[in-house]
Amino acid sequence: MVRLKSRYILFEIIFPPTDTNVEESVSKADILLSHHRASPADVSIKSILQEIRRSLSLNLGDYGSAKCNSLLQLKYFSNKTSTGIIRCHREDCDLVIMALMLMSKIGDVDGLIVNPVKVSGTIKKIEQFAMRRNSKILNIIKCSQSSHLSDNDFIINDFKKIGRENENENEDD
């Protein structure tokens, strides 16, 4: 008997600011805080799954929707961090990621971006990655508030550091 192989997708919901008044002296911490905020109570596991299924049906038709829905599960979602983990079949992973990226509303909440962050074969590794990622974001916010570097220098140094860490993680996998 062949084992059922599944993939886990870590995603985040980003809420871009709707006001057009942008100050020139906005720090990176302010940008991170304005985009990464808690989800409203309307965004629940049930509403996210309904919206994913609706997106699959609209964009892939009956065949794609039926193909992806066979193993589609939302394993975890936190309203405080606006992050979640989806379980899907290995062959349908790309289709589910496409459906996530094409979503622009969940329930009554409109104007959001669903960002697939990482795909993994085990839920343990995706949870570890999510914890490391959240601690990095918190460190970025703390360091940028206390740093005397300009925002551009801080952003460039931070992207170089994250790029080196991602190369090391890819070598470990």
UniProtKB/Swiss-Prot annotation:
GO biological process, one term: rRNA processing
Any single Gene Ontology cellular-component annotation: cytoplasm
Alphabetically ordered keywords of this record: Cytoplasm, Hydrolase, Nucleus, rRNA processing, tRNA processing
Entry keyword annotation includes Magnesium: no
Top EC class, one word: hydrolase
Catalytic activity, reaction form: Endonucleolytic cleavage of RNA, removing 5'-extranucleotides from tRNA precursor
Enzyme Commission identifier(s): 3.1.26.5
Localization annotation: Cytoplasm; Nucleus
Functional description taken from the UniProt entry: Component of ribonuclease P, a protein complex that generates mature tRNA molecules by cleaving their 5'-ends. Also a component of RNase MRP, which cleaves pre-rRNA sequences.
Family indicated by similarity: Belongs to the eukaryotic/archaeal RNase P protein component 2 family.
Description of how the protein assembles with itself and partners: Component of nuclear RNase P and RNase MRP complexes. RNase P consists of an RNA moiety and at least 9 protein subunits including POP1, POP3, POP4, POP5, POP6, POP7, POP8, RPP1 and RPR2. RNase MRP complex consists of an RNA moiety and at least 10 protein subunits including POP1, POP3, POP4, POP5, POP6, POP7, POP8, RMP1, RPP1 and SNM1, many of which are shared with the RNase P complex.
Protein name, per record: Ribonuclease P/MRP protein subunit POP5
Source organism (scientific name): Saccharomyces cerevisiae (strain ATCC 204508 / S288c) (Baker's yeast)
